[in-house]
Amino acid sequence: APEIAWVGQTEEQVKASGRPYKTGVFPFLASGRARAMEGAQGFAKVIAAQNDDEILGVHIIGPLAGELIAEAVLALEYSASSEDLQRTIHAHPTLSEALHEAALAADKRAIDSINR
């Protein structure tokens, strides 16, 4: 079973607050590293404020989620934006790319998945 880790608000909490927001989701199925590990279940999700891009929440369901969430905890602690995560170099192919890709997807700029 995949691990689950999160920090910050859920999408439901942000929606209930009335604050405009955007989300980016990256499925681990699109991660070469996750597929090689036979751990392609789950996703990484970034929730950011629409107006100033501040990260409001990050949710990871997938391989090593408990390890991967540390970057998101730091991002929230320092009021980072999804663009801050987008500009951070993530090695390829790694599981940590999932957070990078989810941040890119929030602005419809994902590299390894479909932009919706």
What are these regions (language model features)?
Residues A1-R116:
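Flexible, glycine-rich terminal cap/loop adjacent to redox cofactors
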